[in-house]
């Protein structure tokens, strides 16, 4: 009897699946899924062992049951899947492969994780997606066609731009501003063609977006991991689902309704869940077959759902509307803006950026080998660890403390792997013989003299594909072999001399006695000597230097700290006027190209300020005006060297902070418990540095460094208040392009609403005045929140430590008392003439190039044997100015893979260049293959012309004109070595060579 019952269910199901919808009928597409965070309240490994391993196994076993209606499942997080794959016997793996082949398991997103969209960089998003696609291609021969960004806290326009170029045609979104979601539902615009790069690559960034009308979890009472089925009974659940279908169908133009079935770590008992869902599906379809309902139901993948939806739109000639911006900030009510996580856990954000840059450099070094040696496995392992950090509860800083520590451990593991491999790779690239090992010197590290050795050698390496100049700052030990101090202020000369290539080629340096800053002002300061000198390196090149102890060097400037107060510091570009705290008051320009003209004064008025923050890891929420804590200047130092002038101050602030011995919650306007207050003093280190090398592109940038710690219950910001008439608008980047950001009002912002005008920035932010043509730009060392809270104002959030919990799942406050060095560089510039238009924001090419320079500093390696070290250039000719090799890695003994990016202004023409004769290690090019951005899957036409669009904006007017170039599919001619790139376009290729 039971078998007969299931036979009837199968007949009913297949009858409905093949059924062609009639007018007035609704088709429910149930999408079974399990959203498995790669760390959040538990670590990734804790989640895997405790839940995810059994979820995947249970799901596969449930799909093996053929006696039920055809079950389907979508899976996203490939990092978890690799762990599971390595644990499983071949029989279960074969079951999984079978279900993928039969389209019953679909990979959606297919990244290593589901990446955050506000804090992850362009390079890191590409990396984590590529690692996931590599696993999918190698194990299953498939590639994803749909994005599944259901949990990030707001959506970036970088998402459609990248995913479309990874071969995706559709993406599912969830968290958009509550007012927008309401508007889209009312106007049936929850589905639209999303163009991520309207001024850049245009059609190449188009994707069909679907926004959940509610949330990514199962509808009420429809989660079948628990007891809902028994509690409510099949008849009631059937009627509720039919009513749900009718209610939700009014939000869409087509009668196809997507219903997510699952949620966080759902399907722990997939067999039970599917058995109950089978009965629900059969009951719904049975009522339809009996003429009692207009709703039919099936399990679907995203491919099924989008295919049916697009076909209906085409058959009925109903177009999708259009959107060409992003979805920041995200809010779920008027008092809850998810703008805090842009800045939360800044130490983690900064360390991830540092390790990612090192990893990129190591991958490039792997391609530069001349003896066919490369180390792909170690670098791939490091790449996977870095990819985990892109998860939307990792780089966002929204995990519990022990999970954050796990992320640090993963980064440290990757850091060690990358250091070990890059030391070998550079040594191998410089010599075909058996070189001794090089030691990479990280930021904050120092060069070390072996005992009884008066000279050491080191190498600088430029990992960028254009020539670059920097002012190099290197720490050197301050104690001699016999324990004598080398940096005593009573010394009258620098104890070191620096030479390039050999000791006959001595170069001029600034040499200064220093000590590390300790935020607690303890006495255990580490003393050192700092060597500063300008260095210019060719693209992908190394340069050899020698440092030697010498008592009276001719070209070493001994720069002693001055303790008397300076009102200003200067270089060839600016005079920077300082206030009593050694923060900038104004800039006087010495050049007509900076600040509006020679002798023109631009008000800057820098402040280090504090918000009282009653939000949590996700939510930035204030309850009083931003303020400066009571402050004293503890000490000041000024260094006046040949190549720089630097003003340093130590500021002692007094804070009234909340007692952190209890946990407190804030919901809406109600504080559940009054916190006890205590008074503490903190010491903040501030440095402002003007560089004087004679290179205008370097010297125009003012270098800032704040050494600060998190203060409980606060967000610490740096604010510039300028005389630039910006109408409280600013531009911040999404990792690829600058985005125009409007503030909520042109008037002064009332308390509690400041956070509504906060936006994320990955690398750069600026304000400008179209009337005066003046622009103020800042490049950042990590992602952070930025805003313009008043006319001429630009502020950047630097640190947060929370004593309230915002009710978003962490359950405990995100207390973060870590000390960080928050670095950024800022400069005055002119608004390019080609941006004198309604949208503004031109000149993004130079801003992008300068931010890349800031992100990827020269790397320093100390050598043990200089006979195997040399200055060497691996590029034989320069690329055009704005052509950037985004990534490069060895793919085989005689092949390399590259992503090449045209970062030029979107108003410019395409650029053509020749790969032939570009690299010193390539004698001749044998063949070229083109891939999509994954560098895993070939570049094929993922045409979406069948998705008809009105090009009518779903929000106001279109922000940008509709452009049709470059075309979505524009393959290169692989029979020749010339490449053409449109502005903002990225091409991914593999070169096989002789």
Swiss-Prot record:
InterPro entries: Gal_mutarotase_sf_dom, Glyco_hydro/deAcase_b/a-brl, Glyco_hydro_38_C, Glyco_hydro_38_cen, Glyco_hydro_38_cen_sf, Glyco_hydro_38_N, Glyco_hydro_38_N_sf, Glyco_hydro_57/38_cen_sf
EC number: 3.2.1.24
Signal peptide: 1-20
Cofactor section: Zn(2+)
Residues carrying a glycan: 247, 381, 554, 712, 932
EC class (word): hydrolase
Location of the active site: 151
Cofactor binding comment, as recorded: Binds 1 zinc ion per subunit.
Subcellular location: Secreted
Name of the protein described by the UniProt record: Alpha-mannosidase F
High-level lineage: Eukaryota, Amoebozoa, Evosea, Eumycetozoa, Dictyostelia
């Amino acid at each position: 009897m039971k078998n007969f019952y299931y036979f009837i269910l199968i007949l009913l199901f297949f009858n409905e699946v093949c059924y062609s919808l009639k007018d007035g009928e609704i088709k429910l597409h149930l999408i079974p899924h399990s959203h498995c965070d790669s760390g959040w309240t538990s670590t990734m490994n804790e989640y895997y062992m405790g839940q995810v391993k059994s979820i995947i196994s249970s799901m596969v076993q449930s799909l093996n049951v053929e006696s039920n209606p055809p079950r389907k499942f979508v899976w996203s997080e490939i990092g978890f899947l690799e762990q599971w794959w390595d644990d499983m016997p071949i029989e279960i793996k074969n079951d999984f492969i079978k279900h993928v082949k039969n389209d019953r398991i679909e990979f959606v997103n297919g990244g290593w994780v589901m990446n955050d969209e506000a804090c992850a960089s362009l390079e890191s998003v590409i990396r984590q997606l590529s690692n996931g696609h590599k696993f999918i291609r190698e194990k299953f021969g498939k590639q994803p066609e749909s994005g599944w960004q259901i949990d990030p806290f707001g959506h970036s326009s970088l998402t459609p731009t990248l995913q479309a170029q990874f071969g995706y045609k559709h993406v599912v979104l969830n968290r958009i501003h509550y007012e927008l979601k309401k508007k889209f539902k009312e106007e049936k615009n929850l589905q639209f063609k999303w163009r991520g790069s309207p001024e850049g690559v245009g059609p190449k960034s188009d994707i069909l977006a679907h926004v959940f009308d509610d949330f990514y979890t199962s509808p009420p009472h429809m989660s079948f991991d628990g007891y809902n089925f028994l509690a409510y009974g099949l008849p009631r659940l059937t009627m509720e689902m039919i009513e749900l279908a009718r209610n939700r169908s009014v939000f869409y133009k087509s009668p196809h309704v997507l219903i997510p079935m699952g949620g966080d770590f759902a399907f722990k008992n997939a067999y039970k869940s599917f058995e109950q869902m089978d009965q629900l599906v059969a009951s719904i379809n049975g009522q339809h077959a009996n003429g009692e309902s207009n709703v039919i139901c099936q399990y679907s993948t995203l491919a099924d759902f989008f295919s049916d939806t697009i076909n209906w739109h085409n058959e009925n000639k109903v177009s999708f509307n259009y959107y060409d911006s992003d979805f920041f900030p995200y809010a779920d009510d008027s008092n809850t803006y998810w703008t805090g996580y842009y800045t939360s856990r800044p130490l983690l954000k900064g360390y991830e950026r540092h390790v990612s840059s090192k990893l990129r450099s190591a991958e490039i070094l792997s391609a530069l080998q001349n003896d066919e040696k490369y180390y792909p496995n170690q670098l791939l392992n490091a790449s996977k660890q870095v990819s985990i950090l892109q998860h939307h509860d990792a780089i966002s800083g929204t995990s519990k403390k022990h999970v954050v520590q796990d992320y640090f451990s993963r980064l440290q593991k990757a850091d060690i792997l990358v250091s070990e491999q890059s030391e070998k790779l550079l040594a191998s690239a410089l010599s075909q013989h058996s070189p001794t090992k090089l030691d990479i010197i990280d930021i904050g590290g120092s060069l070390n003299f072996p005992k009884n050795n008066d000279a050491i050698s080191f190498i600088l390496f430029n990992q960028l594909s254009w020539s670059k100049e920097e002012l190099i700052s290197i720490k050197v030990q301050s104690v001699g072999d016999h324990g004598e101090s080398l940096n005593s202020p009573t010394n009258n000369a620098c104890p070191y001399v620096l030479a390039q290539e050999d000791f006959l080629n001595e170069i001029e340096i600034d040499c200064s006695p220093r000590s590390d800053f300790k935020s607690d002002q303890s006495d255990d300061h580490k003393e050192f000597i700092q060597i500063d000198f300008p260095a210019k390196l060719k693209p992908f090149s190394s340069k050899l230097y020698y440092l030697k102890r010498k008592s009276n060097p001719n070209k070493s400037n001994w720069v002693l700290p001055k303790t008397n107060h300076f009102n200003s510091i200067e270089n060839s570009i600016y005079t920077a006027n300082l206030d009593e705290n050694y923060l900038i008051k104004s800039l006087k320009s010495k050049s007509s190209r900076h600040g509006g003209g020679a002798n023109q004064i631009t008000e800057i008025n820098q402040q280090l300020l504090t918000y009282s923050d009653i939000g949590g890891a996700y939510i930035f929420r204030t309850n009083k005006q931003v303020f400066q804590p009571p402050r004293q200047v503890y000490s000041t130092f000024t260094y006046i060297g040949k190549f720089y002038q630097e003003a340093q101050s130590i500021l002692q602030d007094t804070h009234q902070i909340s007692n952190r011995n209890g946990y407190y919650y804030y919901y809406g306007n109600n504080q559940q418990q009054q916190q006890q207050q205590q008074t503490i003093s903190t010491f903040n280190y501030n440095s402002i540095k003007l560089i004087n090398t004679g290179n205008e592109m370097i010297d125009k940038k003012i270098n800032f460094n704040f050494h600060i710690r998190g203060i409980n219950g606060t967000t610490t910001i740096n604010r510039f208040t300028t005389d630039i008439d910006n109408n409280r608008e600013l531009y911040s980047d999404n990792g690829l392009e600058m985005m125009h950001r409007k503030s909520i009002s042109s008037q002064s912002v009332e308390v509690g609403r400041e956070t509504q005008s906060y936006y994320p920035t990955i690398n750069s932010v600026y304000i400008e005045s179209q009337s005066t043509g003046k622009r103020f730009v800042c490049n950042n060392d990590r992602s952070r929140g930025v805003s313009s809270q008043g006319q001429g104002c630009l502020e950047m959030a630097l640190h947060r430590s929370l004593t309230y919990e915002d009710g978003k799942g962490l359950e405990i406050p995100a207390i973060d008392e870590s000390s960080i060095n928050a670095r950024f560089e800022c400069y005055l510039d002119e608004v390019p003439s080609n941006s004198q238009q309604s949208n503004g924001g031109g000149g993004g090419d130079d801003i992008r190039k300068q931010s890349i320079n800031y992100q990827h500093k020269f790397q320093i390696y100390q050598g043990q044997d200089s006979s195997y070290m040399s200055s060497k250039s691996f590029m034989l000719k320069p690329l055009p100015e704005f052509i950037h090799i985004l990534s490069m890695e060895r793919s085989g003994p005689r092949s390399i893979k590259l992503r090449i990016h045209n970062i030029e202004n979107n108003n410019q023409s395409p650029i053509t260049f020749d790969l032939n004769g570009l690299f010193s290690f390539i004698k001749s090019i044998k063949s070229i293959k083109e891939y999509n951005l994954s560098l895993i899957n070939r570049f094929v036409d993922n045409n979406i012309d069948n998705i008809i669009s009105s090009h009518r904006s779903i929000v106001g007017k279109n922000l940008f004109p509709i452009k049709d170039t470059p075309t979505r599919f524009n393959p290169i001619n692989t029979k020749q070595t010339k490449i053409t790139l449109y502005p903002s376009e990225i091409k991914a290729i593999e070169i096989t060579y002789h």
